[in-house]
């Protein structure tokens, strides 16, 4: 519970502008881990130089961060939020679990840079994301997806 509270202390700036923060998260994910861009068919034709400020990337990034906000505010009681997300990401999008670990680290960096998240907050976010990803992976296994 303390980890969720530690992260939520820094969530305000992100919540105030999901679109720009989300665009930054996905753009950085695609630049640092180019293989992840292939998992998003609607973004495969976008050149790296054109990613920053791309409306579609920013919109999807906002969706990602809004969902993360829901998970954070649930403070661990997130089964009802996570199950449909696990279902779509396993059965429809086929997103390997490792990609959630990659984006988690990008989110930590963006939170540090843009929301002033300190070392304690960064560790708390890593702890929260590890717990969420473990639960996501358990859902994947139930669905028979070994991503």
Swiss-Prot record:
Nitrite binds at residue 60. One of its GO terms (biological process) is removal of superoxide radicals. Its EC number is 1.7.-.-, 1.11.1.-. It is an enzyme of class 1 (oxidoreductase). Pfam families: Globin. Heme b binds at residue 89. Signal peptide: none annotated. It is found in: Cytoplasm, Sarcoplasm. Residues 2-141 form the Globin domain. The keyword 4Fe-4S does not apply. Its main location: cytoplasm. GO terms for molecular function: heme binding; metal ion binding; nitrite reductase activity; oxygen binding; oxygen carrier activity; peroxidase activity. Keywords: Cytoplasm, Heme, Iron, Metal-binding, Muscle protein, Oxidoreductase, Oxygen transport, Transport. O2 binds at residue 60. Monomeric heme protein which primary function is to store oxygen and facilitate its diffusion within muscle tissues. Reversibly binds oxygen through a pentacoordinated heme iron and enables its timely and efficient release as needed during periods of heightened demand. Depending on the oxidative conditions of tissues and cells, and in addition to its ability to bind oxygen, it also has a nitrite reductase activity whereby it regulates the production of bioactive nitric oxide. Belongs to the globin family. Monomeric. This is Myoglobin.
